[in-house]
Curated annotation (Swiss-Prot):
Name of protein: Beta-agarase
A single GO molecular function term of this UniProt record: beta-agarase activity
Active site: 200, 322
Main localization, broad class: secreted
CDD domains referenced in this protein's UniProt entry, alphabetically: agarase_cat
Keyword vocabulary terms for this entry: Glycosidase, Hydrolase, Secreted, Signal
Subcellular compartments: Secreted
Signal peptide range in chain numbering: 1-23
């Protein structure tokens, strides 16, 4: 039996209310009944409480105190890097003996310099955080699909010879720019675990080809056969990294009576499913009715699983390499706390849904880069999604120093959660409920998916009869025009607790 005394309620819409208020929904937490899915029952923080960044990210320079806070106090992990593959592909030299392909000797030399000098010596202060999370890397349509290199410093550009040449480079890149298993940390950054062939390719080359200077859209089938060529060439050099695609930007499968499904995800599974180790998808709630959290997200993953089983005879795991919330009318404006809230109010419910599939969702990464200077607009407007902003960006603040945006509250909300998953259920299907037990502590997670406040009763069973636990509540909600993370302590809480879940909208 699990011994449970203290417990923590974590949600983005939870407050305590007096016990005389009648509740419309009941939630049950069985603290001594383990909940296992295909043998998976542990909360894997390193796979889900992640930043869209790596230790190699130059944004950490000068912000070592913030890196330490994220790693040591909030227990956050890495991460995803789609920039290193672009920069190093652009600097690669063409092989004079094999036109259209990168020179292997140049890859080896530059990789050694990156591993042993840039990482091993220049970034030795970061080695203490080595191995925090499974790294994901990937290609980009402009650099890798178009394949025309753009070197700095007077280098000569050359045209890659299709997916085979790109996969050949990327397979060697992983082998040479990262250390081998068993090597000391001074020999390079830990090698990635996942490789996405292209990031959101159909958005960039099919839906908005003008953004890449293309006159006509590229049909999806061309992108999918490119995936196959890259994967096959990559595996000539490396077979232990999981390859994924097609990194769907907007999985709106039901559009035009599911014609979009037929033309895209179904076609991808038919064409490239056998070449992939994982399926890669992005999920974002928008400011209108185009939202995924809740049943739509479940249906989207179910459709992929079911058709994969029908077409290939097997399902494949998922990697969710970006997720969160957006308010597009606010995206061309300066930073605001309210815009960050649109991200925050979606992130936790989506994470809870990913956690409910521990056997199939291998990792999920909220889209939170660090400074994201690479995304600054031509008019100087900073990138929307960032962990850090400059002081001068907020009203009534001045200064050039970098401080946390409101997005840090996602990590503060989840900072304590860990342990073994236990049984929970609710009488209301519009509530997400989950719970984990670690030693003598229980962590209870509740999220309200409805558009109105909901009263609930939480019943907990399985704690020792003599225990008089202390309950800490973390409550992330919108107050005025800014997110607020409230922390509250309740002592000697009864086995039946009456609460109010506010609406998220």
């Amino acid at each position: 039996m699990l011994k449970v005394i203290p417990w923590l309620l974590v949600t983005s819409s939870l407050v305590a209310i007096p016990t005389y208020i009648h509740a419309t929904t009941e939630v049950v937490v069985n603290l001594n009944v383990k909940h296992s899915v295909e043998g998976k029952s542990e909360f894997e923080r390193k796979n889900h409480i992640k930043l869209h960044s790596t230790l190699n990210d130059n944004d950490w320079q000068g912000e070592e105190d913030k890196l330490k806070y994220m790693m040591e106090e909030l227990d956050v992990y890495f991460g995803r890097d789609n920039g290193g593959t672009v920069w190093n592909f652009n600097q690669a030299i063409e092989d004079p003996a094999n036109i259209g392909y990168a020179d292997p000797q140049n890859i080896i030399a530059r990789g050694q310099a990156q591993r042993e000098t840039n990482w091993g010596q220049n970034k030795s202060a970061l080695h203490q955080y080595d191995g925090r999370g499974d790294l994901m890397i990937g290609g980009q349509p402009r650099a890798h699909y178009l394949g025309n290199t753009s070197p700095c410093c007077g280098g000569s550009a050359w045209q890659a010879k299709g997916g085979d040449a790109v996969g050949d480079f990327l397979g060697q890149y992983v082998n040479e720019f990262f250390r081998s298993a068993g090597d000391p940390v001074t020999k390079g950054h830990l090698a990635p675990v996942y490789f996405e062939v292209l990031n959101e390719p159909l958005y960039q080359v099919t839906d908005a080809p003008h953004e890449l200077g293309l006159e006509q859209p590229i049909p999806p089938i061309d992108i999918f056969t490119f995936h196959n060529d890259v994967a096959d060439a990559f595996r000539q050099h490396n077979t232990h990294i999981k390859i994924g695609g097609f990194t769907v930007a907007f999985p709106i499968f039901e559009q035009r009576e599911f014609a979009r499904w037929e033309e895209r995800m179904k076609l991808f599974i038919d064409t490239s499913g056998s070449h992939m180790d994982v399926y890669s998808t992005h999920f974002y709630d928008l400011e209108d009715d185009n939202r995924f959290k809740g049943s739509r997200l479940e249906a989207t993953l179910d459709m992929i699983d079911q058709y994969s089983l029908l077409a290939l005879g097997e399902t494949k795991p998922h990697v969710i390499s970006e997720y969160g919330g957006r308010n597009r009318p606010m995206e061309n404006a300066p930073w605001s706390a309210l815009r960050d809230w649109w991200f925050l109010k979606t992130a936790s419910p989506m994470l809870m849904q990913f956690l409910s599939r521990p056997d199939s969702v291998l990792t999920s990464i909220p889209f939170v880069p660090i400074k994201a200077l690479w995304g600054t607009a031509a008019d100087g407007t900073p990138y929307n999604w960032r962990l850090l902003r400059q002081q001068k960006e907020a009203p009534n603040e001045t200064g050039e120093n970098w401080v946390f945006t409101e997005m840090v509250k996602f990590y503060q909300l989840w900072s304590d959660v860990k342990g073994t998953r236990v049984d929970t259920f609710s009488t209301n299907s519009d509530f997400l409920i989950d719970s984990y037990v670690q030693n003598d502590k229980a962590y209870v997670l509740i999220s309200n998916l409805t558009e109105q406040a909901e009263k609930i009763v939480v019943h907990k069973y399985g704690a020792p009869a003599s225990s008089q636990p202390t309950t800490r509540i973390k409550h992330l909600y919108l107050k005025g025009a800014a997110p607020r993370l409230m922390k509250q302590v309740m002592r000697q809480i009864s086995k039946k607790s009456r609460l109010l879940l506010k609406r998220l909208w």
